[in-house]
């Protein structure tokens, strides 16, 4: 029996230069702050989303507001939203993240797959391609910046993430010995939960794992996003990137 949370494929849609880099084993991590700025500057609500990173939408008299103000201090960002207050950590905006479309067995069938062969047909939502491709191809001429995509074999992708974890752990241990202090450099990966209703009340406990980075609005469920991120690292600027090199994907890994 195949576990329902096993992945079937991974798809990455981006500029040609970033796809080429990924196939060569170079993962480029951006951050939520960049996507928020992109949404505000261009109106792109597919890749950009100004609602990203919020961990709570609470009524103004909610006692948890006082608790969060005391706990997070200057890291807390508050935005009025009618009778509610939206809460976001400033530090969440610069956590390095890598986003990819991940299709799981549970997505293909209503219940866990049984033994034997199963034929799966999956139609990618047109919004994935239309919004990205129209924006890039209509405004950018350079070939390496045109929109394209790659579909990766699930096991091969998972192996690269395991390799990334090993590499980052070794780098952290070396730095820890050099600086003689305890350090952390975790590589976390999980599927996005599309459970945020922007008109309702919600609260995600803001721990050091930055769980708010794994929640998005319900309307984005068609993106089937899996996110890899470094909760212990922060980029110096929202337009900076963190790069991690692992083994390249050979032709057998590309679907």
Where are these regions (language model features)?
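NAD-dependent ADP-ribosyltransferases
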Residues: 1-255
């Amino acid at each position: 029996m195949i576990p329902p949370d096993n992945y079937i494929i991974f798809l990455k849609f981006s500029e040609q230069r970033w796809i080429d880099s990924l196939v060569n084993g170079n993962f480029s991590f951006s951050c939520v702050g960049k996507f928020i700025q992109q949404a505000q500057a261009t109106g792109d609500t597919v890749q950009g989303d100004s609602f990203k990173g919020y961990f709570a939408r609470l009524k103004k008299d909610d006692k948890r507001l006082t608790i969060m103000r005391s706990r997070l201090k200057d890291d807390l960002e508050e935005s009025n939203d009618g009778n509610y207050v939206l809460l976001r950590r400033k530090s969440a905006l610069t956590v390095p993240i890598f986003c990819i479309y991940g299709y799981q067995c549970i997505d293909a069938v209503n219940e866990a797959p049984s033994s034997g062969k199963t034929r799966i047909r999956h139609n990618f939502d047109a919004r994935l391609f239309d919004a990205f491709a129209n924006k890039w191809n209509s405004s950018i001429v350079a070939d390496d910046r045109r929109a394209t995509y790659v579909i990766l074999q699930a096991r091969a992708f998972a192996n690269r993430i395991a390799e990334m974890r090993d590499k980052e752990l070794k780098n952290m241990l070396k730095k820890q010995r050099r600086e003689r202090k305890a350090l952390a450099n975790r590589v976390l990966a999980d599927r996005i939960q599309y459970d945020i209703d922007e008109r309702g009340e919600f609260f995600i406990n803001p721990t050091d794992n930055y769980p708010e980075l794994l929640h998005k609005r319900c309307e984005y469920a068609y993106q089937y996003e899996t996110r890899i991120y470094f909760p212990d690292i922060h980029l110096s600027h929202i337009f900076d990137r963190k790069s991690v090199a692992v083994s390249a994907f050979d032709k057998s890994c590309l679907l």
